[in-house]
Amino acid sequence: MNLLVKPMVCCPQRFVVHLCTHSTKTYHVTSKHQNKIMEKLVGAAGGNQAAGGAGGASSYEALKKLDQQWLQMRSMTTTTQGMMMIATRKNKRRQEEEQVFDAVVCGGTLGVFLATALALKGMKVAIVERGPLRGRVQEWNVSRKELRELVKIGVLTDAELEDVIAVEFNPSRVGFDGGTEVWVKDILNLGVSPEKLIATCKKRFLGAGGVVLEGMGVSKVNVFDDAAVVLLDDGTTLVSRLILDVMGNSSPIVRQIRWGQRPDGVCLVVGTCARGFENNSTSDLIYTRTPVTQVGSSKTQYFWEAFPAGSGPRDRTTYMFTYLDATPNRPSLEQMLEDYWDLMPPYQGIKLEDVEILRVLFGLFPTYRSSPLPAAFDRILQVGDASGIQSPISFGGFAAITRHLSRLSSGLMDALESDLLDKENLALLNPYLPNLSGVWMYQRAMSVQLDINPSPDFINNLLSINFQCMEKLGDPVIRPFLQDVIQFVPQAKLLISIMVNKPLFIPQILQQVGFLPLLDWTRHFIALAAYSVLWLAIAPSLLSWVESLPKEKQYVWRRQLEAWQYGSGFDYNG
């Protein structure tokens, strides 16, 4: 079976911290002094202007705080007694209020795109953002196809799209220690300025009549029969027909829904943006240069990615990340960051004392098999990372949500216009997607299991074989996969190619994955085939019939057709 890796999309939400500096001082970083180094960077930043979503905090203390959350997550020290009830359902009708919004979007950093799309269609929309509604300094890396989704839904013009691109580069490398090296073009090859992008969308949102409430967090949501009432932490009350939760993995509503659940998978990532790279015209989508590594009392496989940064021709962002389960003896972010200082220079072919550290980045991304998250309450829907729509390999953020903006904006308009805002109808907007669910086996194959002791080179060999076969099969197989799209025919071709060319490697794969995960993957793979047939053979004949149905039935069938399309990967258009 084919066990693959998708490049981590470099636009994480909520659990990321970055530290900024505009100092010209060169830092010689060692693991013993990283506390002092990071605090110097914060001090040099002069004021630490925070941005919503990724990059909200900025100190060594923030790293320790995030590590404490990671410790609690893998130790399961939380209890049901300590659960904070943010969202509650009330049976009685609310009192009439003067102003009722069609939608209140909680979490503006990524929520502003959907909010703007709805406002442009005539909906009365408000955005609630705990901090200031502005983008971070660090670029988001996406493909042009993904970015054009914002033009498709009217959020950006063609000219504005070009203006928000901070840097463009080609080609990109995929490579594994001692094995295959593949070069591709036009995949995650744009660095988009979140500052410009969010400022542009915010201006268009306000121009369409939208309301922005900054510096206010969500304290409570009470759902009544005819509306939802949002209480903000400054005492402000908003009444809305629909609440969109775009607050990412750290959403308090998501924490309530998933309370007591241990994540099925976690990605830990550390990195920097630094100045001083002479050869800086290409990127790495995913790269390894070491076998399985002992980190503390646990073993893990380190992966790398790197991109030119838009802040200068010699500026480069490098990330080191790993996939883990959430068991107690897994390494901390601080341990990984110490390894990063040692491993990044030979990876990039530089000396640490020759580069200027501009930003330090680190993040924690938990994912769950029960995703996308179905609506748990009437009038509340999780969107983006909050819903778990991201792949457990690519880990979401900006590029993950753009793929679904067209589907979500049209679906939400249908729901609002037909007043289909109960949890059963809203759940149709976060449907089962077999191509997403099947990726869990890939995540397992790329992480070192505690109860299995594979060869230190197993993961590198596995990925090398997969990409070697994909390269031979050509663009129709490798390009969709590298853009976070799983399709049945390319996957079937790859499976056959591996079985024919590397039959002796199959038993090792089965040992690494395990019988039950393999059985689970088989179920999703069969569903992927079924969804492909339904979309290609059945859906075209249903389109005119669906349009003849009453609005309520149209809503249900449109969501079903979208589930077949997106669940089979046929939303991908090259």
Regions from the language model: what does each represent?
Residues 140-141, 182-204, 252, 269, ...:
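Short beta-strand to alpha-helix junction loop
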Residues 111-112:
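N-terminal Rossmann-fold NAD(P) dinucleotide-binding loop
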Residues 5, 9-102, 121, 561-574:
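Extreme N-terminal leader/targeting segments of oxidoreductases
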Residues 47, 56, 60, 72-75, ...:
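C-terminal helical "tail/cap" subdomain of flavin- and related membrane-associated enzymes
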Residues 132-173:
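N-terminal FAD cofactor-binding segment of flavoenzymes
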Residues 207-346, 405:
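Predominantly flavin-linked oxidoreductase catalytic cores and closely associated redox partners
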Residues 310-312, 325-444:
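FAD/FMN-dependent oxidoreductases across multiple families
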